[in-house]
UniProtKB/Swiss-Prot annotation:
Component of the ClpX-ClpP complex. Forms a hexameric ring that, in the presence of ATP, binds to fourteen ClpP subunits assembled into a disk-like structure with a central cavity, resembling the structure of eukaryotic proteasomes. Keywords: ATP-binding, Chaperone, Metal-binding, Nucleotide-binding, Zinc. One of its GO terms (cellular component) is HslUV protease complex. It comes from Vibrio parahaemolyticus serotype O3:K6 (strain RIMD 2210633). The gene is clpX. Belongs to the ClpX chaperone family. SUPFAM superfamilies: Glucocorticoid receptor-like (DNA-binding domain) (SSF57716), P-loop containing nucleoside triphosphate hydrolases (SSF52540). This is ATP-dependent Clp protease ATP-binding subunit ClpX.
Amino acid sequence: MTDKSKESGSGKLLYCSFCGKSQHEVRKLIAGPSVYICDECVDLCNDIIREEIKDVLPKKESEALPTPKQIREHLDDYVIGQDYAKKVLAVAVYNHYKRLRNGDTTSEGVELGKSNILLIGPTGSGKTLLAETLARFLDVPFTMADATTLTEAGYVGEDVENIIQKLLQKCDYDVAKAERGIVYIDEIDKISRKAENPSITRDVSGEGVQQALLKLIEGTVASVPPQGGRKHPQQEFLQVDTSKILFICGGAFAGLDKVIEQRVATGTGIGFGAEVRSKNETKTVGELFTQVEPEDLVKYGLIPEFIGRLPVTTTLTELDEEALIQILCEPKNALTKQYAALFELENAELEFREDALRAIAKKAMERKTGARGLRSILESVLLETMYELPSATDVSKVVIDESVINGESEPLLIYSNADNQAAGAE
């Protein structure tokens, strides 16, 4: 290497071999064998290295893992009800990340198993929201997959490996981050096999998908192309260890209550030993779900091996009217708060009367869509107001009552100017 130096009055003038600045232009010039580097270039190199390794550095040991109580408290801020499910999830998630932090084997040589989770509950009961809230709180990558789109390898549809590919996309293809992520597979009940007995014919979207998911959920090293499944076979594959990924599967399991009821029924005997059951003893779907056993899931259509990969099973109950009213108002991101924030951007206050909230909850109950139906009801009720409000002047408040929800009247608009109020009333 040619030394960048020039003769000056008292000797050589030295230059940085990287940026070309002279020794007089920098604070410090460090000499090496035939090369020099200035303090500014050293700082720049440090910045580059820090930027590249900051995402893969392990978390400090001092950074404590949230306790099950802390996880549950955070879930309470965003999810109403489902207390038992929250407790089960908090413990399972805590144990999973404790296993990752301390290794699969304890000091006594005890191997710690992987605890994937199965959520059983009706539509709109909060299964997806629980999984999303957990991932956000723990600051780990999260992705959702729809089990109905999955097929066995070699058939039209999505490979199960595409689930991991989506997770990698969420964290910019950082494998170390992806291996600490959470995957939520929705509609898992839709891949139940079509008959209770093993089928002779191919069931590529039912039992076949369950077989394909087995290894992925239990833990394997999945080879995933960065740009998607079967269409780019020439690309270099990324190796992802799925034993460190937490899988949460959820489904409504419509009809499972009948399977459970059939098993627990005691009034089917004959003769003097038969137990007579009252018609009033009929249990709700939620109550029956709490009595679910692996044998019920097998009868429903999940294969025993698949059920064995989901050792933590918890059920969610149907949301009643009071719970739906709470969901509308209490969570940090409650729907009424979201719409109030939108109206605030137009310098208007949005107020929901108590009877309006109850009417919204009743409508959602009638639709049997749980909390999922609340937004569509609010959207249709507020559509005209949200259309007119940006063009209106002096509207300071919008009041919604029961008659508005039932379509019997328009929202009450309160103007800051008395003249406008009178004109609006006309």
